[in-house]
Amino acid sequence: PLDGSRPTPADNSGYFDHTPQNIGMDFRRQAITMLESMGISVEFSHHEGAPGQQEIDLRYADALSTADNIMTFRLVMKQVALEQGVQATFMPKPFSEHPGSGMHTHLSLFEGDRNAFYESGSEYQLSKVGRSFIAGLLKHAAEISAVTNQWVNSYKRIWGGSERTAGAGGEAPSYICWGHNNRSALVRVPMYKPGKTGSARIEVRSLDSGANPYLAYAMLLAAGLKGVEEGYELPPGAEDDVWALSDAERRAMGIEPLPQNLGEALTLMERSDLVAETLGEHVFDFFLRNKKSEWEEYRSEVTAFELRKNLPVL
């Protein structure tokens, strides 16, 4: 619905569900056919964990081409949805009781034809460049969050309580850490496949489906390359379920939280030389003004939660 009323999921299917009554099967088929006719390759697709939630993974490309493909992808999804009588949304968390939608991004850094993230014999086959790149992402994660997670609703996905409950299937990172195959970490180092040196990579899991890919990828590259240029040391990895740890345990491991809301994220962004230098004065100032206005509008909104909880008893 476009009037702000509560939406209804297009189906009640679950993770990897392939039952015939799953509307997503035909939706994905039609969408992928259209994407590939436009030269945008798709590697995988399946139903995700939440009702009505679909995952379509685009094949890798350089950063700018990937951002272009994402913008085209979003338009295609919305067009196909309209043709099928449903609405596609990239809102990070449209349902409080279901997991949100991320834009998990796999990336590698190349010097010519050589994958600069790969080093034979090192831990996880991850090079010093790769380790410093991750360190840069972690060190600057909080201050770039207003760009990588730019909506009020983005922080409902990051901090949504239902995503921590058993079986909810939510995998949005709330804390700044990295790990090997750890889906609770902000940065994950996938398992290396022998002989696939070109595919050595990292996965950034904080981005959500509503992010501006041009700005978000610019900030990921700036933060990572800052780590490489200045030789940041990578802290120890987290292999435990970070969500299950206590605050004291996380503090002992040096693991800090991401911003709790857009207001916190904007405060950190406003103080950030890295974000200002990367975006440039015009974009930096415009982005801040626009997002501060959105945050102030949200803060003054009387929500359905307040009416439900307070109106009958106060």
What are these regions (language model features)?
Residues 1-314:
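Glycine-rich, acidic/polar active-site loops that bind/position phosphate-bearing ligands
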